[in-house]
């Protein structure tokens, strides 16, 4: 257990020092390395880490958070960075596909890379880190309880995410209209909220272990959106909310493929199989 914790800590530190912030720096393209070298990346099950070759983080651009870049509040264990940290992962002979990755609670911009590189081996991956830190873990917005969230903060972070991503797309000449957005848990929730608040941004999305987080929101025009939701049938806390999210997206006209797999809240091979089938 100590060894695993030590490895995870080193990888988290490596990701933090090799990433940059929206509108700053040029992330360095990276190469795919051996399976063994990719095993320490967090965010998915051990079985998938064993079988997936993953991009090496490489040298990249060092961007350390300064005190002036973090807003703190009187609340205990809460802070917010002023920028979103991001990193590109581009394999050799990359296709024109762009996959935007939003991690779950406690993750970072590298967390979903093993999963995504397995499904889209030639795509350019854009991993983004949520800028909220609460109770020692990274998040996309402030939570009140595990299933109740600060409504003002959800909207604040969704709007900030869209503004920053749009600016980055303009600078890097990225075509977001053909991008696939992949979110897990907290990241999937932020992505779903973003779709409701900014319906023109996301045209294709994968939402894993997600739930609706906005209490009152107008029905958005999602007629051009395709969405895959993946729920773990053993995910006792969050699976009961999945039908409500699918219904909300469908009410806006989105084409939703709602799937339930034999899994808990953690990700694994069945998620990769479901997504691969959906994108085929």
Language model features with spans:
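A domain-start/cap signature at the N-terminus of enzymes
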Residues: 25-98
